[in-house]
Amino acid sequence: MMKNKQAGNTLIFVLVILLLITIIGTWAIRGAITSLNITTNAQAQALLVQNSDAVFFQLESYADHAVKIAKLQLDNGMIGYVNKPENKGKELVYCLRKSEKDDKYNLGKASLVYWQGASISKNEMGQDGYCKVNKATDFTSDRGAVVTRIGARSILEGRKDWGHMYEGSDSETYGGKDIGTIIINATSFIPNLSTASADEINKCVMNYPSFNVVVDGVTKDSVADCLSKLN
């Protein structure tokens, strides 16, 4: 009888030990997963910043390249096009594709998006400028991780005297043409980290400008706002 009782106690003791090991192991796994998420998020943020910054670094380098900056200022160049009076407030959209290293800002590869009252206009120049996350060619590199959407818009509000003129020019230079105030926005995101479908993400990229616009007293969402809501 004593032997059976001892065996029972031993069994209970062993079961308790196994239960403790299971609990500790679960805590360790949860801790590891949490740490992995933090690392992944940090890496993702760094990757997004790197891709968006690359857009601005390249555009800044154009300022020292007479031919490249001149192309941007032509009527069919990014700056020249959005600076036309009839295009003020409209956003010219490009997809930063891995295959287009040298000719990113070709007007034939751009799209135009803007609000017309409460409706969005997005097909005036076709849809080649909108990134599609279900197309491997629309990612920024062969890794197929990041998609970057570039938006350019010329505005009239908030300009300072002479701040809209070409450097070293006067009111008669280039026929009195000015560059306006050009705002460039680069929106980068990693589709694989989202639970949203490709169709939902593509709609955000196409149906919203990069900038918040007030229409009839209502502030409209931007591309970033739409993507954030998708999670």
Model-flagged regions — what are they?
Residues 48-67:
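N-terminal alpha-helical signal peptides/signal-anchor transmembrane segments
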Residues 30, 36, 66-67, 74, ...:
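Residue-level detector of alpha-helical recognition elements and their boundaries
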Residues 62-97:
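Short, glycine/small-hydrophobic-rich surface segments
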Residues 2-4, 13-51:
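Aliphatic-rich helix starts adjacent to a transmembrane/signal segment
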Residues 96-231:
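Intrinsically disordered, low-complexity regions enriched in Pro/Ser/Thr/Gly and acidic residues
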